[in-house]
Design a protein with these regions (language model features):
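Core segments of transmembrane alpha-helices
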Residues: 61-73, 143-150
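Membrane-helix exit/interface motif
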Residues: 28, 46-50, 67-79, 102, ...
Length: 166
């Protein structure tokens, strides 16, 4: 069982790292680059990004990480006091209560609004202005929470030790 929890924690740490990196890219340069375009070109570009992200390669990592974190949170509670259980619970919950719901409840609805507009319309320009004002802030939050979740999961792994070496 220790080996299974270790591997699941490693996969969750890798998942949160990949997601934090993806979110970090948006926070540090992608949204700035899109903001430098005209509203029409920015909308077209972001609509293309939104369409591309709805593919299995991203969705498996995003939802797979959430499932792993839910399982790991339960495992940490069931085996409370075991090496790494505190970090494991904290990291799993931080992703489940931070990056995951922020994405689903804030960023995705904003994406949906943006994909529904015609890029060269007044409504499109209005939605783009609101999108830029709020999407980035929510993205910063999910970036930080995914990164901190990753760090906590790595600390859990360090505290668990390598069960394959025993």
């Amino acid at each position: 069982m220790a080996q299974l929890i270790f591997v699941a924690t490693l996969l969750a740490a890798l998942g949160t790292a990949l997601l934090a990196g993806n979110f970090f890219a948006f926070s540090t340069f992608l949204m700035k680059a899109l903001g430098g375009l005209s509203a029409e070109r920015g909308i077209v570009a972001m609509q293309a990004i939104i369409a591309a992200i709805k593919k299995p390669d991203f969705l498996v990592v995003f939802f797979g990480t959430a499932v792993l974190c839910a399982v790991l949170a339960g495992s940490a509670l069931l085996h409370w006091g075991a090496p790494g259980s505190c970090y494991l619970l904290a990291g799993a919950l931080l992703f489940l209560l931070g990056a995951f719901p922020v994405t689903m409840l804030r960023n995705v609805p904003l994406n949906t609004q943006l994909t529904a507009v015609t890029p060269d319309s007044k409504k499109g320009r209005d939605v783009w202005k609101r999108f830029q004002a709020s999407w980035g802030m929510w993205n910063h939050i999910r970036t930080v929470t995914a990164l901190l979740a990753c760090a906590l999961l790595i600390l859990a792994l360090a505290e668990m030790g390598n069960p394959f070496a025993r």
